[in-house]
Amino acid sequence: MKPYIIGISGISGSGKSTFAANLKTKCGDFYAGDVVIINLDGFYRSINEDDMCLVKAGEYNFDHPYAIDLDHARRCISAIADGHLVAVPIYDFEKKKCVGHYEVNNPRVVIVEGIHALHPKLFPLYDITAFLEVPMSVALSRRAVRDNKERGRTPEDTAEMFRKFVLPMYKLHVEPNVKKAAILVNGLNTGVHINMLYEHIKPLLIYPRF
């Protein structure tokens, strides 16, 4: 059975992870094991000693596509599509390296989410794609809350990272993908599109897609 693969992109802080989680929740507990979320953050490259100096100086660009091993991500998603048991990496942002894996085995629906989810290396793998749009002020505010909670950064640090890396990389590498997305989602009101996607994939959960 070939899984149905959904790609979800948008600027950092647009609500991609929440959108993916809410879509999976919408599918209900009965089908929870048939719906898998793959966060591309898991494919961040482990930081070597030389790059660690850049990280400590606030000069390492985590928002550039190269920071994520997109080739590895493509191989994993392709293998899942082909029905193989796949070990998906888990990245630790504190240690700046891969710290383990979790197994994905024969899901019916795969939700791939990340800022570079619609990168040309990954785009051909999807059956449908969505792009979340929010005002930049909202994206920055959400990013500041997450960075403070998960990474101990001050709002000032987050604002500087946003100005230096997030926004330029978004304009250069992420925003151009908007025109390729099948669905544009208002990141401030996602309920309509969650319901729409759910109705789209519900038959796939009931009847296998060969």
Swiss-Prot record:
Outcome following mutation: residue 200 to A: Complete loss of ISR antagonist function, but no effect on uridine kinase activity
Reaction equation(s) it catalyzes: uridine + ATP = UMP + ADP + H(+)
Catalytic class of the enzyme: transferase
One GO CC term on file: host cell perinuclear region of cytoplasm
Binding site for ATP: 10-18
Active site per UniProt: 41
InterPro entries linked to this entry: P-loop_NTPase, PRK/URK
E.C. designation(s): 2.7.1.48
Location(s) in or outside the cell: Host cytoplasm; Host cytoplasm, Host perinuclear region
Family named by the database record: Belongs to the uridine kinase family.
Subunit details: Interacts with host eIF-2B; this interaction disrupts the interaction between eIF2 and eIF-2B, which leads to the inhibition of stress granules formation.
Protein name: Uridine kinase P10
Biological classification of the source: Viruses, Riboviria, Orthornavirae, Pisuviricota, Pisoniviricetes
